[in-house]
């Protein structure tokens, strides 16, 4: 390979590497954003689950508060 061909090849590889570094950093930032969003959504699911559980238990009256069934 001639020196100019080697130099051209080296420049191409350096250009590819620079592009890949930018792409990797962008992907890393995207992953970080997704992790934050997943964490936020998990917390929302936990809060909603707790809210549903509390509503379910509040809908069931204790036996002592139940009205007796009608007698026919």
From Swiss-Prot:
Gene3D superfamilies: 1.20.5.300. Residues 54-66 have a biased composition (Polar residues). Residues 52-72 are annotated as: Disordered. Disulfide bonds: none annotated. PANTHER family: PROTEIN SLYX. Belongs to the SlyX family. HAMAP family: SlyX. This is Protein SlyX.
């Amino acid at each position: 390979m001639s020196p100019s061909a080697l130099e051209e090849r080296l420049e191409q590889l350096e250009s590819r590497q620079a592009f890949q570094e930018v792409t990797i950093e962008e992907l890393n930032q995207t992953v970080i954003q997704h992790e934050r969003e997943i964490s936020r959504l998990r917390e929302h699911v936990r809060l909603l689950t707790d809210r549903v559980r509390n509503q379910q238990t509040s809908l069931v009256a204790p036996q002592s508060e139940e009205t007796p069934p009608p007698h026919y």
